[in-house]
Amino acid sequence: RHTLYCTMTYIMTFGIFAGFSAAFPLMIKNLYTPLDKSIDPLQFAFYGPLIGSASRVIFGKIADKTGGAILTHITGIALIILISGLILGGYLTPTSPDQFQGFLVIVLAIFFFTGIGNAATFKQFPVIFSESPRKAAGVIGWTAAVAAFGPFVFNVLITQSRAISGDARLFFWFLVVGCVCAT
């Protein structure tokens, strides 16, 4: 049972981080470059992973002192709010290049919080499985392997969402529900 919850929280953090790392430049290209040719996806592609990685390092030390559960919970709530804002703010169905700045801020904030959550969840696993370090190591390996599918799953499901509904909002609502369940 604990393995399932650990997997869900790690998918919420690292899975979203890895998925957005792959999908972020493509989203810019597909959503905003047609509205303004001067928006270059490659100019922004590395900022998200950089911010997420930096927040993981910085908040890893905080998670080591606090145990990680509170930071994971804060991350879940922040991701629910931010992803909902991406959908409800119209940033996934833009009508103006002026919306790009809001899109960029929200996505970079998502990267920031996934970095925090990534550090916090990895701190929790050895605590949750303190009776068996071997089990803790297995859970860390399992959750990392499952969450590593993030880039593949993100792009496949965004494509499917666009095929079904014409845009990616369906996938992102699914992501919100996943974050609610993991939080």
Show which residues each predicted segment covers.
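C-terminal transmembrane helical hairpin of 12-TM major facilitator-type secondary transporters
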Residues: 67-120
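Extracytoplasmic gate region of multi-pass secondary transporters
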Residues: 2-53, 122
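Juxtamembrane helix-start elements in MFS-like secondary transporters
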Residues: 36-45, 99, 103, 136, ...
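A membrane-interface helix-boundary motif in multi-pass transporters
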Residues: 158-179
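Helix-to-loop junctions at the C-terminal end of transmembrane segments
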Residues: 55-68
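A late C-terminal transmembrane helix in Major Facilitator Superfamily
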Residues: 132-165
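Residue-level signature of mid-helix packing/kink "hotspots" within the transmembrane helices
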Residues: 49-57, 148, 152
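Intracellular juxtamembrane helix-capping segments at the cytosolic ends
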Residues: 116-131
